[in-house]
């Protein structure tokens, strides 16, 4: 017996119904205010679905509004836009919502091209033709299969493990655990399962896979139980670095609603993920002990950190649906910036938060240098290049110690994590202030 279809909680917007009757051959600049506003609002909500911040969404909506000779004001959050368009005589107000949020740089890049070329190409098209073009852009889903995204998470978390102090055994176990965990997460997302279920199951599966591999190693290879330290690294693919960082950028531009909503979304993911990992640790008798010490010459440390940082950023970039050339660009920037951050801490005893600020500032400046040559939005390069600096290990250890009522230790880990999380968007913000005059002023 077939299951009844699940009724959608958010109804689909039939965009072509907003076009004027008999307006197929009329340029959109001569269309009604309703038709113009439908183009502006649809582009805005599509940009928002790609994960970009409120300032960028509003800027793009303004570009289209100016080209069509209307005025647009917009209030933008994480999942919705309320906007009004004026043409000097009438006003049109609409509220648009997303069903889910995520990151899709491939779609974002196509939308950026659409906006850049609108003045020369889009103004001559009819509203119906523009909606047809937006239909084709909206169909751009993930570039990669769940298997490929699982491998990307495995590469990222394997590199992450080394940067946190893990050795080959921890890296291999985290590689397998993260790969399986993110594969499951992608399959659940593809079938539209709710956010909480996806987080709990994927994190639990990653931790279980790590623990299972380690137990096999203990039985057959007589591995030390201290290698359990890396189980945290198997779940770091879930850390929401993108909304964490974009929330800081939005708050810097006083887009309070978007910034607070993005921060709240990131905190929800952190809370559910760390609680799931903590419960799995209790069930599997795992503890976040220190990694076994690795002794290497300074030159080897630097080279291996460059390589591990490259792998980590490359993997996260693929998870954010970036094309391979763009992922490589972000990985090169991230390798330089993150290695600089780590060496500042190790060689001259820089406070970790200050080093994180300099690392993020470096990433932002490097991204600005290649922005025009790369032809991609700046955020597509800057955010992935510093996501690897988000202190997921600190956040988990803070929650783990909170769970066992070691409150002083928990506060120490949380304080360290908060300082670094604050420093990362500040570094990108100051890089943007230094290199982008449109961002420098309050407009």
Where do the model's predicted regions map?
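Soluble N-terminal domains of membrane-associated systems
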Residues: 1-132, 136-138, 142
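Short juxtamembrane and helix-loop transition motifs at transmembrane-helix boundaries
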Residues: 128-141, 155-166, 185-193, 284-297, ...
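Core alpha-helical transmembrane segments of integral membrane proteins
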Residues: 143-246, 319-320, 324, 329
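Hydrophobic alpha-helical transmembrane segments
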Residues: 147-151, 171-176, 197-201, 263, ...
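Alpha-helical membrane-inserting segments
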Residues: 159-164, 180-188, 205, 209-217, ...
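Structural signature of hydrophobic alpha-helical transmembrane segments
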Residues: 161-177, 226-240, 292-308, 348-362, ...
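Membrane-interface helix termini and inter-helical loops of multi-pass transporters
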Residues: 217-226, 284-299, 401-412
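C-terminal transmembrane helix-loop-helix hairpin of multi-pass membrane proteins
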Residues: 230-235, 246-250, 254-270, 332-443
């Amino acid at each position: 017996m077939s299951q009844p279809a699940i009724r959608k909680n958010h109804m689909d917007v039939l965009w072509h119904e907003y076009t004027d009757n008999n307006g197929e051959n009329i340029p959109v600049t001569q269309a009604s205010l309703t038709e113009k506003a439908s183009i502006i609002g649809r582009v805005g909500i599509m940009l928002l679905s790609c994960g970009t911040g409120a300032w960028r969404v509003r800027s793009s909506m303004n570009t289209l509004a100016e080209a069509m000779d209307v005025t647009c004001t917009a209030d933008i959050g994480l999942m919705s836009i309320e906007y009004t368009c004026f043409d000097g005589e009438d006003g049109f107000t609409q509220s648009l919502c997303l069903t889910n949020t995520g990151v899709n740089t491939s779609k974002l890049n196509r939308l950026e091209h659409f906006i850049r070329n609108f003045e020369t190409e889009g103004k001559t098209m009819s509203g119906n033709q523009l909606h047809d073009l937006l239909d084709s852009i909206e169909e751009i889903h993930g570039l990669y299969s769940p298997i490929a995204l699982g491998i990307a998470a495995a590469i990222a978390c394997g590199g992450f493990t080394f940067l946190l102090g893990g050795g080959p055994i921890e890296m291999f176990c985290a590689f397998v655990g993260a790969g399986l965990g993110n594969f499951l997460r992608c399959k659940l997302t593809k079938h539209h399962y709710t956010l909480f279920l996806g987080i709990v199951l994927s994190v639990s599966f990653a931790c279980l896979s790590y623990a299972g591999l380690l137990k096999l190693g203990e039985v057959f290879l007589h591995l030390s139980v201290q290698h359990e330290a890396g189980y945290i690294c198997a779940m770091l693919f879930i850390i929401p670095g993108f909304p964490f960082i974009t929330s800081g950028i939005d708050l810097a531009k006083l887009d309070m609603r978007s910034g607070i909503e993005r921060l709240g979304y990131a905190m929800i993911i952190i809370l559910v993920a760390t609680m799931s990992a903590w419960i799995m640790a209790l069930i599997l008798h795992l503890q976040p002990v220190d990694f076994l010490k690795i002794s290497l010459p300074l030159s080897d440390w630097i080279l291996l950190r460059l390589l591990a940082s490259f792998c980590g950023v490359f993997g996260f970039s693929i998870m954010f649906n970036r094309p391979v050339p763009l992922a490589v660009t972000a990985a090169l920037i991230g390798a330089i910036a993150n290695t600089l951050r780590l060496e500042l801490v190790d060689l001259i005893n820089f406070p970790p938060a200050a080093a994180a600020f300099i690392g993020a500032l470096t990433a932002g400046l490097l991204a600005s240098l290649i922005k025009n040559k790369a032809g991609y939005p700046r955020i597509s390069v800057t955010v992935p290049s510093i996501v690897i600096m988000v202190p997921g290990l600190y956040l988990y250890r803070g929650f783990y110690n909170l769970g066992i009522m070691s409150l002083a230790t928990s506060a120490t880990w949380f304080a360290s994590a908060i300082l670094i999380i604050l420093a990362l968007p500040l570094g990108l913000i100051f890089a943007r202030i230094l290199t982008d005059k449109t961002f420098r002023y309050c407009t």
